[in-house]
Amino acid sequence: MSGSKLSTPNNSGGGQGNLSQEQIITGTREVIKGLEQLKNEHNDILNSLYQSLKMLKKDTPGDSNLVEEKTDIIEKSLESLELGLGEAKVMMALGHHLNMVEAEKQKLRAQVRRLVQENTWLRDELAATQQKLQTSEQNLADLEVKYKHLEYMNSIKKYDEDRTPDEEASSSDPLDLGFPEDDDGGQADESYPQPQTGSGSVSAAAGGYEIPARLRTLHNLVIQYASQSRYEVAVPLCKQALEDLEKTSGHDHPDVATMLNILALVYRDQNKYKEAGNLLHDALAIREKTLGPDHPAVAATLNNLAVLYGKRGKYKEAEPLCKRALEIREKVLGKDHPDVAKQLNNLALLCQNQGKYEEVEWYYQRALEIYEKKLGPDDPNVAKTKNNLAAAYLKQGKYKAAETLYKQVLTRAHEREFGLSADDKDNKPIWMQAEEREEKGKFKDNAPYGDYGGWHKAAKVDSRSRSSPTVTTTLKNLGALYRRQGKYDAAEILEECAMKSRRNALDMVRETKVRELLGQDLSTDVPRSEAMAKERHHRRSSGTPRHGSTESVSYEKTDGSEEVSIGVAWKAKRKAKDRSRSIPAGYVEIPRSPPHVLVENGDGKLRRSGSLSKLRASVRRSSTKLLNKLKGRESDDDGGMKRASSMSVLPSRGNDESTPAPIQLSQRGRVGSHDNLSSRRQSGNF
């Protein structure tokens, strides 16, 4: 071993000295050399003795004893030399082995040091990983709580009476399937419904091919079933119609392509994108073969394929299809047609999902120019396109440009609803008042909109679709942008107006549904606000105490012949301690959530129904009965009295001549009754 010491006799004084391993090995090597020389000398002497011994045995046998003794001594010395040489070689091998052991030991020590360091690192990493695991478990628990909360909120969303049409709209909006009146080829919420055209223009736009009326009816029926998620009815209906068309007209017929498009729409709603894609490819081949490669129907099918690829996230595959559809529409319809603008919007959306923002801006700006030129600056598509362009600006961080577009939309809506007067300093768009409040830090005393809430009247619902009101969306987006800039007071004003706009939009949709159910002529109806103003004036002039309130949607014919009121009666004031409900005998209590309505069966009793379709059927039956009864007893009525029909429940009170109080409900609910109206009028209870 290196550095080890061995004791050996000292030549000078016979004392003990310490030798290192290297010195011992060096001395051993010298000893081996000396022993080798002695061995060789002894071998030479031994050989000479052997020769002398042979000669003496021949000449004088008596003198050979001395030589033999010498020979024995030399042989013993030679054996001792060989033994010494062997031991010296063993010592040399042992020294070499000790050196190897020492080197291995040093190597193992270095490895131990490295392993100790690695172990320290691993312990640190393990501690960090355990900390991350603990944090992840905590986040997972929080996410589970949030997920359950969102699940609950989603479950009760359908019971929210203040939901706007955009919240109620489903993802089953029709695609561009070749039906001009349903030409909606946008993706999801980015769609742009186009103005309806007559049958003549439809035929002209289709290049002489007009879609049969039966296919239009079937399309609307399938859309209705799909919107109700009744795919088990819609799919067999489409397949049967497709089979019949193929038998009568053959596979390569435009009607077959149209039916393939309808079936593709149903499969799209079921998220069966592969089946829908196969059908659209088949329809595209048929239309290209029968109608030509530059036909508008081919562009519609290409657009549908692009939408389908977009829904699957295949934006690169969808972009060339959308561009080809754009080229066809520009060639057939002209570069300034609204359908071209709609296609530009779809193409911009695909490019936006790929991050091609320069192309996105160009497409949106060109679409905006077309809409403003052909449809006018007040068309809803202009505001929608500006909103989409502003969204693209936001994704690029161009907040100033987005803010400018939002303000343009709100300013135009303000001018359209309230007008613009340079003399009236208070007649300003809502964003101006919001920024003034932000600067002053308080509400203005002379706010022209009544705490800024009346501005929601400017948020009109697009009558051609159930998409969200553009102005309401703009209010929310600009409010979010103000919050990003730290303008919290201004954001609160816009958000408050957006909330009131949602409720106003819901009322307008309900009014439209009521008009459709009752078959009223929209052009001869007095607006709801005027009818309700007349009702309030009549109540104030009569001095009738207001024990209960009735929220109603009223319409009055301009000729004064009939007034129709659809009302919901409930208690105007409720005490916190009194939760009891005053409901006449024979009627059913209407809970608020989930919302149900009371409809009347044939026996005159009310039953609860939670289906809008059942409500419509009941309203139609009740309206028919009411009209028949009114026609049969029209001569008995006073000519100066205005006839009225009410869908509100009028409880019977026997022969009491006093005015019946409305039904008092602690929660809102809709009620309908018509069958006993004439009998009540005759008995004096009307």
Curated annotation (Swiss-Prot):
Subunit structure: Oligomeric complex composed of two heavy chains and two light chains.
A matching Pfam family: TPR_10
Coiled coil (UniProt feature): 20-160
Major location (coarse): cytoplasm
Keyword field contains Transcription regulation: no
Compositional bias annotation for Polar residues: 675-686
GO molecular function (one): kinesin binding
PANTHER family hit by this protein: KINESIN LIGHT CHAIN
InterPro entries per the UniProt record, alphabetical: Kinesin_light, Kinesin_light_repeat, TPR-like_helical_dom_sf, TPR_rpt
Alphabetically ordered keywords of this record: Coiled coil, Cytoplasm, Cytoskeleton, Microtubule, Motor protein, Phosphoprotein, Repeat, TPR repeat
GO biological process: microtubule-based movement
TPR repeats mapped onto the chain: 215-248, 257-290, 299-332, 341-374, 383-416, 472-505
Matching Gene3D superfamilies: Tetratricopeptide repeat domain
Post-translational modifications: Phosphorylation may modulate the process of mechanochemical coupling.
Record remark on domains: The light chain is composed of three structural domains: a large globular N-terminal domain which may be involved in binding to kinesin heavy chains, a central alpha-helical coiled-coil domain that mediates the light chain dimerization; and a small globular C-terminal which may play a role in regulating mechanochemical activity or attachment of kinesin to membrane-bound organelles.
Residue numbers spanned by region Disordered: 1-23, 158-204, 520-558, 586-686
Family: Belongs to the kinesin light chain family.
Function: Kinesin is a microtubule-associated force-producing protein that may play a role in organelle transport. The light chain may function in coupling of cargo to the heavy chain or in the modulation of its ATPase activity.
Protein name: Kinesin light chain
Localization annotation: Cytoplasm, Cytoskeleton
GO cellular component, one term: cytoplasm
Species: Strongylocentrotus purpuratus (Purple sea urchin)
Classification via SUPFAM superfamilies: TPR-like
Keyword Cytoplasm: yes
